[in-house]
Amino acid sequence: AVSKDFVHWKFAGYCSFDGVGGQPDSEKTYWAPGVIVEGDSAHMFVTLKDDSTPVWGGPSNIVHFSAPLEDMISGWRRVNTVVDTPISIDATVVKNGDRWDMWYRDRPTEDTGGLYYAQSNDLYHWTLKGLAKGDINNVEVTKHTYQEGAYAFQWKGYFWIIADPHKGLAVYRSKDAENWEYQGIVMYEPGTRFFDNTRARHPSVIIRNER
């Protein structure tokens, strides 16, 4: 969907990948895309499942697609697989100086679930760094045993991550995008507008006029 004011939106079509898709239903599952623009290209880091069977479409990887800015509906072409563990989901990417940082939900083993991070100097080659540092995976501080759908951005001199622990949205901030401090929960109570009758889930943020 596209908008000029972030209030009024117009449906623009269904995305296709490597020329396949463009319809409401797909044999594969693409969810929780993290999209970043660099130069004249858009880069999508999406949770990709090779089927769409209930309930969640089977094992998943985080896969990199790119598209020219003038065709962000049907221009997506696969670049590579960034995270190949079978339960990796929900990537978010932010530029940090001369590099890019990614965070995602993963559970490589039964006892190591949490938010993980990776770093890249070019968006194409990534180094997996392990569990995110600071308070993000510190249950004693946050009381959150599960978080997904994280979104990272920069605002007012800090890097921020807002994640979904299924009880409102958990907020973290950091000066260096590595050592995170927990800021608490927001949007726990349901809203009052039409279709806004539940607590917030899976966030995304756009900064306009310093807000």
Positions of PLM-derived features:
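Carbohydrate-active catalytic/glycan-binding domains of CAZyme proteins
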Residues: A1-R211
